[in-house]
Amino acid sequence: MDNKNSVIKFENVSFSYNSKKQVLKNVSYEIYEKEYVCIVGHNGSGKSTMSKLLTGILKPLAGTIYLFGYAISRDNIKFLRDNVGIIFQNPDNQFIGITAEDDIAFGLENRKIPRGEIKRIIDSVADKVGIKDILKFEPHKLSGGQKQRVAIASVLAINPSIILFDESTSMLDPKGKKDIKSFMLQLRNQGKTVISITHDMEEVVNCDRVLVMDHGNLIKQGRPDEIFKDKQFLRDINLDVPFSLDLAMQLNELDEKINSTLRYNELIDNICSRVDQKD
């Protein structure tokens, strides 16, 4: 990442609630332009607090958060919120409008975008996330996955450079989870910086880099394959190994030519290749 531009930088950031024990302890890291980063950790690790700091909901007790090289303060909090969009865990917490269309329009109207331009933007983002047929629907008529698509469309409408998913798949059924994970990859491929705070290790497989939190400390970071190769490390901090890798590792114990891999398609190809060789 040496040639990448830093978009977010945490420099020795600490935070505590009501002067109690610190929930973030001297955390430092950088996230780069067009990168897809997952932040993982067990409950109480500090990852949710980090999302509130990233969006300006909370202010660090100590240290500095930089956005595109600018230190974030009360004076430029609008700059932060214009550039960082967030998709929450519970899509119901994000709905403001009477219909899906109204909800997408809300942020645009606040920015005084002309009505004709609002209609064009809504049609564009609705098409991107596949919700053109539900724009007139009321929230209670939508599934969890549809609500999250509307939430994504609402964020895309204001066109932030960075999109933060805060446990955004945890309340969805398998199809809804698959759809949202696919959108994350699409957004990264379209040039957005994507940050996902998650406990879903199957999602982490597809990201560029993982930040591992434990008891308020950033204890490890690296590519998914670097993080997941140490199963004992993950068990020690109460995190799971993705099923595909766990299965591959077990098969590797039976046949050392079956490589440990994070991806199902690679594992299947590997197994088929070994079967063909033995035939």
Swiss-Prot record:
SMART domains named among the record's database cross-references: AAA
Places the protein is found: Cell membrane
GO MF assignments: ATP binding; ATP hydrolysis activity; ATPase-coupled transmembrane transporter activity
Subunit structure: Forms a stable energy-coupling factor (ECF) transporter complex composed of 2 membrane-embedded substrate-binding proteins (S component), 2 ATP-binding proteins (A component) and 2 transmembrane proteins (T component).
EC number: 7.-.-.-
Protein name: Energy-coupling factor transporter ATP-binding protein EcfA1
Gene: ecfA1
Keyword Oxidoreductase annotated: no
Stated family: Belongs to the ABC transporter superfamily. Energy-coupling factor EcfA family.
Keywords: ATP-binding, Cell membrane, Membrane, Nucleotide-binding, Translocase, Transport
Gene3D superfamilies membership: P-loop containing nucleotide triphosphate hydrolases
